[in-house]
Amino acid sequence: MVYSYTEKKRIRKDFGKRPQVLDIPYLLSIQLDSFTKFIEQDPEGQYGLEAAFRSVFPIQSYNGNSKLEYVSYNLREPEFDVKECQIRGVTYSAPLRVKLRLVVYDKDAPANTVKDIKEQEVYMGEIPLMTDNGTFVINGTERVIVSQLHRSPGVFFDSDKGKTHSSGKVLYNARVIPYRGSWLDFEFDPKDNLFVRIDRRRKLPATIILRALNKTTEEILDLFFDKVVFEVKDQTLMMELLPERLRGETATFDIEANGKVYVEAGRRITARHIRQLTKDDITHIEVPVDYIVGKVASHDYVNEDTGEIIIAANQEFSLEDLANLSQAGYKKIEVLFTNDLDHGAYISDTLRADSTVDRLSALVEIYRMMRPGEPPTKEAAEALFESLFFSEERYDLSTVGRMKFNSSIGRDNDEGAGVLDETDIIEVMRKLIDIRNGIGEVDDIDHLGNRRIRSVGEMAENQFRVGLVRVERAVRERLSLGDLDAIMPQDLINAKPISAAVKEFFGSSQLSQFMDQNNPLSEVTHKRRISALGPGGLTRERAGFEVRDVHATHYGRLCPIETPEGPNIGLINSLSAFAQCNEYGFLETPYRRVVDGQVTDQVDYLSAIEEGTFVIAQANAVLTEEGTFADELIIARQKGESGLHPREHIQYMDVATNQVVSVAASLIPFLEHDDANRALMGANMQRQAVPTLKADKPLVGTGIERNVAVDSGVTAVAKRGGVVQSVDASRIVIKVNEEELVPGEAGIDIYNLTKYTRSNQNTCINQRPTVLPGEPVTRGDVLADGPSTDLGELALGQNMRIAFMPWNGYNFEDSILVSERVVQEDRFTTIHIQELSCVARDTKLGSEEITADIPNVGEAALSKLDESGIVYIGAEVKGGDILVGKVTPKGETQLTPEEKLLRAIFGEKASDVKDSSLRVPNSVSGTIIDVQVFTRDGVEKDKRALEIEQMQLKEAKKDITEEFQILEGGLLARVRTLLVAAGVSEVKLDAMDRKQWLEITLDDEAQQNQLEQLAEQYDELKAEFDKKFETKRRKITQGDDLAPGVLKIVKVYLAVKRRIQPGDKMAGRHGNKGVISKINPVEDMPYDEKGQPVDIVLNPLGVPSRMNIGQILEVHMGLAAKGVGDKINQMLKEQQELHKFRNFLQKVYDLGETRQEVDIAALSDDEVRTLIKNLRGGLPIATPIFDGAPEASIKELLKLVDLPESGQLKLFDGRTGDAFERPVTVGYMYMLKLNHLVDDKMHARSTGSYSLVTQQPLGGKAQFGGQRFGEMEVWALEAYGAAYTLQEMLTVKSDDVNGRTKMYKNIVDGDHRMEPGMPESFNVLLKEIRSLGINIELEDEE
């Protein structure tokens, strides 16, 4: 196996046995691909902005004299880059410019004579852009647009499963759902009539739709019924016989022909009878005359002499009608064929219930239902019906909808119009009637072939189209009104509605969410989340069990494990590791193709529909060397059912064992040994892990840690290979390899690192270089670690030495006992950065001012402020300290204009100001790490703002100069090579100024040309950098675009270092969570025979009932892995030769039957030394899920490092030194510190703010509220008879306003008495009763 440069530094031993057919695809592609589709120019005009423009333009004026056409669009460059946008609190977006063409026709000339054409580029608002990591920066905060799982457009056949009607009869229905437009529903009622609803309004007989499509009764009956023909011969009736139609009927008369009785009267007709009739080729039988009574005429029968209708279509026959018909000379009579089994008379019955007679009356009926109360006219009724399903402006099935529609009603082709036509509607009714007749199945709505993914691009496009449609109306009106000769396209378009629609979507849509930025995993998972909620989706309250449940088609597409606990369970899902979206938006998953029992490496992506009938083997099926199945019978899936299949029948095979689950669940080692509920908690809690001060890779991992870390974008990854030229804390410079150069560039890549910035969750984002100068790197290598990554691997927590044993009740109910050593070594110390901001506004009484001159504040309180009134960087502050001094004018009276004038002339200071400074919140203390000042354009900058500006300019200049020097050096080095090759002596060159080299003239023309090219490049480079600096300078010095009424904003960043302490929540990766109960001195912790104490003691009772055995295996494996590190340390202590290390390492990596081949001999001595150095803390191990290390391998590894195979050690009590009576399971578990810190939750109140109406204290930490003494607590005091305690609880401690002020005063005076009065809530009750019109008065006791 080939390892990249970073991977060689620390090779993870892989216990996986199945070969890796397919690497996990790029994890954020669902976001990036979708958005790229949205903004890229699409010549077909099917997707993105192009599609939106084409669907709205051209816009015709009402009078037809002019139209506005769309030509093309382009997105300009964004003004600020992502980092600048985050600092300034603005949206990262690009201006959209659209080229429009206004065509004016000559109204006096014949039709369509063009009078004038004007083209112009028009600004159409800003389009937020996606960053490289799949997020959007909206108003300075990073947000993610979550993809939505919604019902695919198309037609769905469903039933109510017998729940609607009391009889329990199953009623079937069909629903045509367009991508946009009105829904069309067909449904049966309990009497088997077919009804139609439009947009879920009141129902009408379904035949009204057919009548509105201009069908007569005869045509309607023709469409849905077969006919039976009777011939009238000399007083007898002969019936045309199709034997198949008789099955299941009971003969009411003898069925005979040619003198032979086939079925006696009263007998049921069976398949045997039908076979005999078919065999004897019987085509007609005689039937009694009354057999036709009750049958239904298929068309009108007219007496040709008189012109009167004897019997109308859809009327039932009587004997009288029969007589009239034979009198009128009819020899053949056609009736509808119906029976109770599989040819119901539904449409015929519905026609009888339908009161309409022709097209107009049907249209009027539909109009009345859609627009009740409006008087219908013929034109209005026609226009309404036309616009409902047949107009492209109002109705669109979309490509997906048409594809699903056609496949649902059994057509072969995928294409078709976006609107419906009459055949579509008739086919839907036909299929619904077939289903009612028992032919065909209803659809499964939860099948992933019926639900599709709507991603960012598509949702943004829809919003954009909404904005365009709003603009369209305005444009139409302006075109009809204005003087068209003077008007330009720019005057017609108002960009506001468009940008408003887009802004609203990105800023406040339910699916635009504040990014979860706790750690790299939570970022990745958030971007891969699939929600069924949101606009056009489900609501929590309405969603039943079926929608939330795991469906067979989720296999390899949506994760069955990772979903929130609580009301959203099952509605919010996560994409499986290998899942992708196809062009229609359906989820696909990869499978290896199996050809004639041979498993190939060809991978096909199948959607849930395509997967339908295939037989698919699991990834852990045993294969032979040749790639065929080893066993005769193989566990495989077909149509969602698992079973045993012969190996010849297998058509596909899973690509990987973690194909079923999401990324977060694939990070849990030994997942296969955990109960699903606990695995769910484990997957969810990894997302809440806070990045620790020193990241520590998991000793026991699953091998995909590197994928997550690199794809999340928190690490710096080499874009091209090369050699590291220089490294410091904030930048890495790489000289690119010759073969990867683009001709004519300097060949230097510069990576600027992010230092100590704040994440959305207030954790700290910081990148640290992992490479040294002179090291070779290849493309894709990790150059710098981000938060929670260690040498390019995800590292969410710390490897802790744990023991499973009770310890004095300190681990009762999942509590955790932690050693003091963990605190001393800062293992779980985390840095949290808070942003506090102070805004100076313009008020009615004058403007607020940021200043150090604050009334009634002592010197001590101002000690940390500079002369501008802003805190120094590096100051240590605690609760209540002033960070930014600010005063607000408080005016008793509004100034008269005269006074204002005098003030303006003599510059008198505002009469009266009050202190409104920004202070540190009560429970917070920390260090100031950064201050930023934003000043409105036109307001003079204060001293501090100018200092910050100078500093930023200096930094920018330094950065740009250094970058220029590096690139210049690269270019001049190439010049030197060229000159030396041309024969210029090196001594001379070194004596000259380097820039003069470019002025040398060479004899060889080709070389001279090359030199001139390089000189040209040098000039270009210089010009580019000057321009770059100028742009940067402009950005830094220009005023900021602040909200209206805001003069200045000061943002202060405060870093808090939080050590672990009792009350913090910790967890393992298997759903084993708990709260720290005590930090124990090291000397009291249990220790082993070598004297090594454990770090954490966990309760063994937390394992059996929760069935997460994975944690036990992880602990044993961790012990073995750490054992390898200890062994290496011992060998280093003994100063053994390098070849012994090589042998030991080879032995370790060869252990077990694994797919991994590590050849230690192929590594250079330096590489082996680096590897040894990185393995001293333990050997990192990968046990992929469902393909992990077996028990035997764990025992083998334990044996190799001289540890007991049981994984249990003899422990001694740290307090007494006595041995515990049984060996204890000790090992290493990867523990996480979750973002539920006791510091954020602890809260106490003495006095504080009160609610306005009830006058009771507020609740919650944010409001500095009190503890609620609720109903049940009152009952408890009542039960104890504690009357006085109860009285003070209900009065002075709560809402007796006078009582509590008096009591406060008494306490100050040292007099501890209370006088309870009337609680305010009682007054509220009185007022409420009075508001009902009942007067209630309190009488004083005389």
Curated annotation (Swiss-Prot):
User: Which EC number(s) does the record attach to this protein?
Assistant: 2.7.7.6
Matching Pfam families: RNA_pol_Rpb2_1, RNA_pol_Rpb2_2, RNA_pol_Rpb2_3, RNA_pol_Rpb2_45, RNA_pol_Rpb2_6, RNA_pol_Rpb2_7
Q: Do you know which CDD domains this protein is assigned to?
A: RNA_pol_B_RPB2
Q: Which domain of life is it from?
A: Bacteria
Disulphides: none
Keywords of this entry: DNA-directed RNA polymerase, Nucleotidyltransferase, Transcription, Transferase
Gene Ontology BP annotations = DNA-templated transcription
First-tier enzyme category under EC? transferase
So what does this thing catalyse?
RNA(n) + a ribonucleoside 5'-triphosphate = RNA(n+1) + diphosphate
**What GO MF terms are annotated?**
DNA binding; DNA-directed RNA polymerase activity; ribonucleoside binding
Q: Does the keyword Transcription apply?
A: yes
InterPro entries, alphabetized: DNA-dir_RNA_pol_bsu_ext_1_sf, DNA-dir_RNA_pol_bsu_external_1, DNA-dir_RNA_pol_su2, DNA-dir_RNAP_su2_dom, DNA-dir_RNAP_su2_hyb_sf, RNA_pol_bsu_bac, RNA_pol_bsu_CS, RNA_pol_bsu_protrusion
Which HAMAP family does this entry report, sorted A to Z?
RNApol_bact_RpoB (MF_01321)
Name the PANTHER family on file. Answer: DNA-DIRECTED RNA POLYMERASE I SUBUNIT 2 (PTHR20856)
* Role description: DNA-dependent RNA polymerase catalyzes the transcription of DNA into RNA using the four ribonucleoside triphosphates as substrates.
Which proteins does it associate with, and in what oligomeric form? The RNAP catalytic core consists of 2 alpha, 1 beta, 1 beta' and 1 omega subunit. When a sigma factor is associated with the core the holoenzyme is formed, which can initiate transcription.
Write the protein's name. DNA-directed RNA polymerase subunit beta
Native source species: Aliivibrio fischeri (strain MJ11)
Q: Gene for this protein?
A: rpoB
